[in-house]
Amino acid sequence: MTYHDSHYDEDLDLFDEARTEKIPAVRRRGKQPPPPPRKKKRKTFVWIGMVVVLALIAVGGYYGYKQLTGIGDYDDFAGQGKEDVIIQVKGGESTGDIAATLHDAGVVASSRAFVVAAESNAKVRGVQPGYYVMKKQASGKAAVAKIVDPKSQVGQFDIKPGAQLESITQPDNTVVDGITAKLAKASCADLNGKSTCVPPEQLAQVVQTADLAKLGVPDWAIPDANKAEPKRRLEGLIAPGVYDVKPGSTAEELWTQLVSASATQLQAWNMPTLADNTGYTPYQVLVMASLVEKEAITKDFGKVSRVTYNRLHDGMRLQYDSTINYVLDRPAIRTSDADRDKVGAYNTYGNSGLPPTPISAPGEGALKAAAAPEQGAWLYFVKCEKDGTSCFATTDDEHEANKNKARANGAY
């Protein structure tokens, strides 16, 4: 910048040598041309820095986008794969989550290999939670084709309300698989040419001998379950529903997976607090729910539960045919006098009170009915319609009339 001096401004004789020699140095600097501006250079460097930063952000964003969308190069195996491996798909998982699981298990070379291949197969979005037999070192396309194949899913089975541990032979000689038999079948898978099946006998042995707490039985059920006949300790403690177990597990591991999942379901149905204010323990409510499940169709659950409460309150024997049938190899719609006369813990014609364990797997509706029965004075009921509807009575005479009606309707 130019330096100004008042004395210098008054002397205009710029060519006087004498005067020039006496001019202070600071004044001579005033004649020099102004230095070049530096602010422009600073601005240029700032702009260059900003461009570099933006470029780095763009490159990083593009790389991340490639990772998410599968654009660009990625590792991929060739072919259908080699050895078998079981992987688990959990509820709520996305395609990316499944891809990560497959990569961790060595099924695909990279998650992106599966994600890219899945884009051309809409069935991937329908993959359900559970266990799947996959091939290691498979191409992304082969892995997608494998996981959407229904034959690849293993270890899944369904338990219906009213199911029992042991299988039942119906009057027409058809066999209804019990929970133990279903678990045995669910344990089966073919892994590298070897079967993972666990025989029903091994599973039954675990029911009789395993530590119930280690199997996952809820604390509120353990004392009563341990008092039961060994083969019936888990009766009623497997809630109805769809279950997934991992083939290749031991007999005890299979039961632990099943019982633990069931305990979670029972808790979701508000057990054991559901039994509060009933006058009965949670296990007793579970027993009553199993009777309701076996004795009635859904619309009559509340009334049958009330009959149970009323008869127990009045000291009457329950006299439920379902408890007689429970211990028979071949249950019948109408039990015989001989069967009703047999001595046994589950004979509610000969014994007062509830049977020692549940006789089936009660569903949520039966549990709620057992905890909160309908209001009424009924003491008797009989199935009086072919659809399973029951007729209820408060007196023995009314009950006899209902039985005659049932016969006339061909209900039994």
What are these regions (language model features)?
Residues 1-40:
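Acidic/Ser-Thr/Pro-Gly-rich, low-complexity N-terminal segments
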Residues 32-74:
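Hydrophobic single-pass membrane-targeting/anchoring helices
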Residues 45-51, 92-96, 339-344:
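A broad, low-specificity signal for short, low-complexity segments enriched in glycine/proline
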Residues 66-249, 256-257:
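Signal peptide-directed extracytoplasmic domains
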Residues 188-191, 203-412:
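Bacterial extracytoplasmic/cell-wall-associated proteins, especially those involved in peptidoglycan
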Residues 37-47, 86-90, 333-336:
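N-terminal short leaders/motifs
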Residues 9, 20, 71-75, 90, ...:
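Intrinsically disordered, low-complexity regions
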Residues 2, 7, 64, 345-348:
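Intrinsically disordered, low-complexity N-terminal regions enriched in serine/proline/glycine
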